[in-house]
């Protein structure tokens, strides 16, 4: 086998890529593949002896790559178009900074040399996904009472994101007396959850008897996606019972029972007159 030598002044092989970086989409359902092109530049002063080039492409941080053609035979100086296929891992973090390297060796007669390698920075494209749920999406309270919901947001994207909240039917609920405090923005790291408590107040008005289910329509919006990614979620409150402002519910119930009792006695007395 010929002894390996450095590329001499009479023959050289270099790789030149057409771009120094490439963006790869790793979101769910994507191919996670990107293509770049370049040339394999071969120079020799001895066109009588073929230059045989073997190329390979490698990646870091779980990224793989292939180069085509991987073998080249040139008689004299030449420039051969090459294509590099890059495949990233699905759902990779945007923080990843993989590098793809195209390198190889060449032979010309008894001489063996290293191909002048080239590198390309792989940029992981961010994607944004939200999941929201509550451990208590349905709460039953007495009219006039408050309710506290436990909300859990999960950042399912591959980049840190900030979320803002909107109540789609806020006008309708506030118009009948509900108090719905604004929910502060949340910033959550990728693939991480965050829990928050949200208190609402049912209408403070006279209610002799009520048994009604109210729906609060929440919308969570990803700010880093410029509002393109959003998630709807509904919470439910059943107000059941009576409410007279300034009185304890138990006392109100006793008062109503007393009034009902007096009315029944009055009617009974009227029948015997």
Indicate residue ranges for each PLM-predicted region:
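Long beta-sheet-rich domains in secretory-pathway and surface-associated proteins
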Residues: 1-273
């Amino acid at each position: 086998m010929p002894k390996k030598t450095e590329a001499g002044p009479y023959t050289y092989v270099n790789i030149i890529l057409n771009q120094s970086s490439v963006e790869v989409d790793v979101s769910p359902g994507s191919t996670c593949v990107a293509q770049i092109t370049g040339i394999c530049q071969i120079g020799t002063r001895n066109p009588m002896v073929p230059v045989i080039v073997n190329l390979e492409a490698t990646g870091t941080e779980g990224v793989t790559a292939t180069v085509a053609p991987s073998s080249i035979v040139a008689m004299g100086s030449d420039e051969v178009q090459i294509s590099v296929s890059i495949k990233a891992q699905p759902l990779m973090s945007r923080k990843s900074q993989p590098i793809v390297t195209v390198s190889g060796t060449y032979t010309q007669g008894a001489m063996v040399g290293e191909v002048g390698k080239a590198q390309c920075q792989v940029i992981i494209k961010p994607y944004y996904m939200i999941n929201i749920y509550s451990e208590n999406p349905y709460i039953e309270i007495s009219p006039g009472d408050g309710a506290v919901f436990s909300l859990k947001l999960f950042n399912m994207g591959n980049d840190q994101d900030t979320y803002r909240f909107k109540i789609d039917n806020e006008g309708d609920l506030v118009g009948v007396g509900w108090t719905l405090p604004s929910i502060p923005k949340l910033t959550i790291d990728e693939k991480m959850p965050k829990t928050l408590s949200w208190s609402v107040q049912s209408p403070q008005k006279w209610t002799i008897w009520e048994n009604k289910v109210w729906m609060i329509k929440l919308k969570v919006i990803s700010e880093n996606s410029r509002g393109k990614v959003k998630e709807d979620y509904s919470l439910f409150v059943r107000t059941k019972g009576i409410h007279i402002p300034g009185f304890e519910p138990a006392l109100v119930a006793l008062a109503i029972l007393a009034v009902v009792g007096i009315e029944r006695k009055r009617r009974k007395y009227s029948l015997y007159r």
